[in-house]
């Protein structure tokens, strides 16, 4: 009978593995978007001795440098001893950030509730995204070029938003569907408010927000 990797490790290796797993989980938890991943990766490579390529005037064998592309890609290099025409060793990875993105004008009111209109990105299982707390994470670029980082939901004291689901007593039709259809993409709108503004007739909840 085959053994798992865990069964083959000694106690010291198990401790090392658990520490690696914790650091990996912590990294993913704060790297929900490509931009966040790149920013956090910069901190890691700089800690490992890499320097920003734009700040280096001369390269020699053994130098460690990195470069980013529009804040959404990162390349890290260790300069070798031989000319690049002789080849290079390359490791590549895709920054995958499955998520629901806000549409251009997302805020709308329906049946006394205010929601954010979304479209999903990546190969997500849509039913996994309902009835759980979510964070609003991203970047806003103002007309004057000012960049504002947004992160609402990661801190325990932040407001909580989420995608609502049907109660089991109302979900007979839903439960008969396949996993791909049990929650449709158009149903992934985020609930953000239900308190109406006083003395407002049209879209009072939206007006309050």
Regions found by a protein language model. Name each.
Residues 1-209:
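N-terminal hydrophobic/helix-forming segments and targeting peptides
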């Amino acid at each position: 009978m085959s053994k798992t990797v865990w069964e083959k490790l000694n106690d010291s290796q198990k401790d090392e593995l658990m520490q690696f797993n914790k650091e990996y989980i912590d990294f993913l938890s704060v790297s929900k978007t490509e931009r966040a991943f790149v920013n956090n990766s910069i901190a890691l490579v700089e800690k490992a001795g890499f320097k920003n390529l734009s700040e280096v005037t001369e390269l020699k064998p053994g130098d460690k440098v990195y470069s980013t592309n529009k804040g959404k890609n990162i390349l890290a290099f260790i300069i070798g001893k031989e000319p690049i025409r002789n080849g290079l060793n390359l490791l590549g990875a895709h920054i995958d950030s499955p998520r629901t993105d806000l549409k251009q004008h997302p805020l709308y009111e329906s049946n006394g509730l205010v929601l954010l209109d979304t479209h999903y990105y990546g190969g997500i299982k849509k039913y996994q995204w309902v009835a759980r707390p979510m964070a609003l994470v991203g970047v806003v670029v103002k007309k004057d070029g000012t960049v504002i980082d947004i992160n609402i939901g990661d801190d325990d004291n932040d407001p909580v938003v989420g995608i609502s689901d049907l109660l089991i007593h109302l979900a007979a039709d839903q439960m008969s569907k396949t996993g791909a259809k049990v929650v449709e993409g158009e149903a992934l709108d985020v609930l953000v408010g239900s308190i109406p503004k006083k003395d407002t007739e049209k879209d009072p909840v939206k007006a309050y927000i």
